[in-house]
């Protein structure tokens, strides 16, 4: 029978204590090894709570699935802000650079329907609109158009998907 343990853990800093240790102990798996794998997979989400699913089959094989925090949370973390703007049309709370948008897009890669970096970056920029966050000093919608027009192709040349 397969057992599933779901928990919210601090990115890159999970430990064998609660909630993981007590849940994994009865399943007979190497808790330290599982925690190390979780920390490796969640390293990019340092300082954020990350949803993790640990799947253990009858032969004690362990599979770890890591979810990603919401895009808005990743944007706020990148900017170092607590919340978005209450007046998105008139109040700007931060400005992302194209490399920062690309970093967030790579983090969301597994959770989006887009097939390439540019399309996922446009999704991230779409999240910036109601938050009052600009990208490269311009409104996020304008930056999406600039991205489509190839304005940032030179910056993205070294960005891996």
UniProtKB/Swiss-Prot annotation:
Gene (name only): rpl11
GO-annotated biological processes: translation
Alphabetical list of CDD domains matching this protein: Ribosomal_L11 (cd00349)
Protein name: Large ribosomal subunit protein uL11
GO cellular component: large ribosomal subunit
Family: Belongs to the universal ribosomal protein uL11 family.
Gene Ontology MF term list: large ribosomal subunit rRNA binding; structural constituent of ribosome
Oligomeric form and interacting partners: Part of the ribosomal stalk of the 50S ribosomal subunit. Interacts with L10 and the large rRNA to form the base of the stalk. L10 forms an elongated spine to which L12 dimers bind in a sequential fashion forming a multimeric L10(L12)X complex.
Cited PANTHER family: 60S RIBOSOMAL PROTEIN L12, LARGE RIBOSOMAL SUBUNIT PROTEIN UL11M
Keywords: Ribonucleoprotein, Ribosomal protein, RNA-binding, rRNA-binding
